[in-house]
Amino acid sequence: MKYKDLREFLTLLEGQGELVRIKQEIDPYLEMAEISDRTLRKGGPAILFENPKGYRMPVLCNLFGTPKRVALGMGQEDTHALRELGKLLAFLKEPEPPKGFKELIGQLPQWKQVLNMPSKVLGKADCQQVVLSGDEVDLHKLPIMHCHQGDVAPLVTWGLTITQGPYKKRQNLGIYRQQLIGKNKLIMRWLSHRGGALDFHEWKEANPDKPFPVSVAIGADPATILAAVTPIPDTLSEYAFAGLLRGQKTEVTKSISNDLEIPASAEIVLEGYIDPNETALEGPYGDHTGYYNEQEYFPVFTVTHITMRRDAIYHSTYTGRPPDEPAVLGEALNEVFIPILQKQFPEIVDFYLPPEGCSYRLAVVTIKKQYAGHAKRVMMGVWSFLRQFMYTKFVIVCDDDVNARDWKDVIWAITTRCDPSRDTTLIDHTPIDYLDFASPIAGLGSKMGIDATNKWPGETSREWGTPIKKDPNVVKLVDEIWDQLGL
């Protein structure tokens, strides 16, 4: 399925009963977040608030509030099909030459999709139908949501921040929350390992004291939005991956005030710069952990231009204790991760990030164990192979007879196959999300690996237990007479 823009996607969702329009006046201050939270928790539809209190612009929430809508946004019917996207990413990350003509023919569909990777640059774009500059710029006129009563200010949540480092050809798209602090000022909260922060760091070294150009797109097409949160290889641009998802090239146009390319169909675009010498104290905000985070200084984004479509839609979300939209995205994108990990570690059978683990803080891996110490190798691989798992605090490794997605199965494996002293691996002084206040130092903490696999010679000197198995003949017999037993 191809969606040229966000509006085409909303039309499809509405036709499937996956979008509800609310005409009643609803306040962006707390009320929208409360309604969105209740709706998401019951697996409800996306919401278009058509009458925000005090504003003329409608607000879209809960767009990716179910795994099904995430899959639809990526052009698939369900989350199971996302495995194929993961296989494509694994292929692009480490392409292998075909071993023969038959394998070459088999790879043609993948290479054909590569033709959709280059962006298509438009001279005229819908996202620039309305242009505001100078004193016309006033962020207070946007219906920016205030999500929790303890939040310090309204927060831009679904903005796609577009940056480019001085030494890179490709541009980076990332989603970083942005605190409103003035009519043309936002605080750009990005962690040091994220693409935008890395671009900014390189810019400051190459261009001391010079403003760093930034554009932020709000309400892009679903493929571009989801490309910004998908674990794509560092060498692949988000626009290129969006083209793969969409099955046609991503249409972009040049920003009015800088050379950055922006999604041509975006609802709203904020353009401006970051002064390397200007920072502000960000937070506190309720975040995906279910707690308010600590305050910290981050760069200030000065907005010089706002461009938008006529009758623009403001796209927003909230974060809080799971389930929330980031947790749902994590659950769906879990299926994309698996083939990427399996390409590097073929012994991995399943990989699961439980939503209640705040999207990425705990992982359960099942493997076909082949030798003593195998579980520890997989732990180290999870922590080091993909940047997305740099902040995963707990990795539990089980055998392939355990269902990684069933806590009863996992806990049984831990309690019967794991000795706390022998099978727990602790690593200190590792990168940790600075929002994790449980770590002793902001940004630096420990990790725990739990080996819940059956132990091999060399891992134990005791005779290992034999699992109880039912007699298949008796099971078949009881199946045949079950309906006669009145049970």
From Swiss-Prot:
Keywords: Cell membrane, Decarboxylase, Flavoprotein, FMN, Lyase, Manganese, Membrane, Metal-binding, Ubiquinone biosynthesis. The active site is at D287. One of its GO terms (molecular function) is 3-octaprenyl-4-hydroxybenzoate carboxy-lyase activity. Homohexamer. InterPro entries: UbiD, UbiD-like_C, UbiD-like_N, UbiD_bacteria, UbiD_Rift_dom. It is found in: Cell membrane. It comes from Actinobacillus pleuropneumoniae serotype 7 (strain AP76). The gene is ubiD. It is a peripheral membrane protein. Mn(2+) binds at N172, E238. Prenylated FMN binds at I175, Y176, R177, R189, W190, L191, R194, G195. It is an enzyme of class 4 (lyase). Pfam families: UbiD (PF01977), UbiD_C (PF20696), UbiD_N (PF20695). Binds 1 prenylated FMN per subunit. One of its GO terms (cellular component) is plasma membrane. Pathway: Cofactor biosynthesis; ubiquinone biosynthesis. Belongs to the UbiD family. This is 3-octaprenyl-4-hydroxybenzoate carboxy-lyase.
